[in-house]
């Protein structure tokens, strides 16, 4: 893990601490990435932090997961990245208390091509988030399930990366490529970037496989691993279809409790 794990954001010259920018990333789909982005954001907001969630996935799952009609919004991250909309007209305020959202929809899939000819295209999102770090304690980036220019933008803007890993047989598939990409971005584009940690998702205590995956990852992955493990939970799976994070949809469910514990761990890492 090395000395980079000790890097801290410095207060800007006015003395106010800048918000942390956490990219939730894994190019493997179906690992609970959007679920983690939604519910970590909501549980940090529940604890009184001012949070901005940015949906960087053209599928728009984080957008709809907060009850926003992704097909009925005029301004999204796509328009913001291309300079076709103002930030104030793009941010959806208070999707839940203390939590704002920059939404996305399928239009964002065209950004990859349209950004190609732009100078310093890797830094476009950073230019946006750097202006927002004084307003929010946390900015959570839900990355697309691929290592494309949108993900590179997220890693260039982020202060740290959180990687959800599903407790399934192919859990480590592609992870070495993601970590290599993170290392390259840190070396060439974003010196402050660090590994926030790995969080296990969709854990099923009834199966030996889940336990084996956890043990295998711990043995083979030289990264911070969160103590909190997110269980496979029916209520957690239902919540997005109702447009609510789990702590609102079913506050007493195992899914809600686990994401509250994850939020506590994230907060504790800020204090250490």
Can you describe what each PLM-predicted range is?
Residues 1-7:
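Short, small-residue-biased leader/transition segments that mark boundaries at the very start
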